[in-house]
């Protein structure tokens, strides 16, 4: 496999997972709002969440971050109840157990492959910030997650 082919394949497999239109999500009716969860509540996470909320087609219903203060700050800003705010390295897994249509991954890049794979495994659509991974094994994990998401009609 050439580097060019790898990059093209990885990019194509992830691209479909980043487009979240209500009419494409299984079970979502036309003009209905998409329930999303945010993984990573730092500055960029709150910024992208604000864009989703301002768009009007999304409800931010769950949050996860390693740090409690970040989750609480974002929860207060977006009106997410305390019982839908999760903390710790694996707090995002509790978020994935919630009734969500999609997740927005804005955590540090070295967590992206594992979090995206777990989100696809949980049947969620994924919007993942770049860089999607920091090494080749992470890129391969993302590529495989994209293939699984396509096979399961998640993108």
Model-derived features: positions:
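C-terminal segment of N-terminal export signals and the immediately downstream linker at the start
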Residues: 19-56
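Short amphipathic alpha-helix with an adjacent loop that forms part of the alpha/beta core around
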Residues: 92-98
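N-terminal Rossmann-like NAD(P) cofactor-binding module of classical short-chain dehydrogenase/reductase
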Residues: 102-104
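Short acidic-hydrophobic, aromatic-tinged amphipathic segments that line or gate anion-handling sites
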Residues: 84-89
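N-terminal secretory signal peptides and thylakoid transit peptides that target proteins
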Residues: 1-14
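NAD(P)-binding Rossmann-fold cofactor-contacting core
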Residues: 57-77
């Amino acid at each position: 496999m050439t580097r060019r082919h790898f990059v093209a394949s990885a990019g194509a497999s992830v691209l479909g997972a980043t487009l979240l239109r209500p009419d494409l999500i299984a079970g979502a009716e036309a003009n209905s709002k998409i329930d999303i969860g945010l993984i990573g509540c730092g500055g960029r996470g709150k910024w992208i969440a604000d864009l989703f909320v301002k768009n009007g087609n999304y409800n931010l219903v769950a949050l996860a971050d390693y740090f409690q203060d970040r989750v609480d700050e974002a929860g207060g800003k977006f009106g997410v109840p305390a019982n839908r705010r999760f903390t710790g390295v694996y707090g995002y897994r509790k978020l994935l157990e919630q009734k969500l249509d999609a997740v927005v991954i804005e955590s540090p890049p070295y967590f992206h492959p594992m979090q995206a794979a777990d989100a696809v495994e949980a049947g969620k659509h994924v919007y993942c910030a770049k860089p999607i991974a920091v090494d080749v094994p992470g890129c391969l994990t993302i590529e495989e997650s994209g293939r699984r998401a396509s096979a399961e009609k998640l993108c």
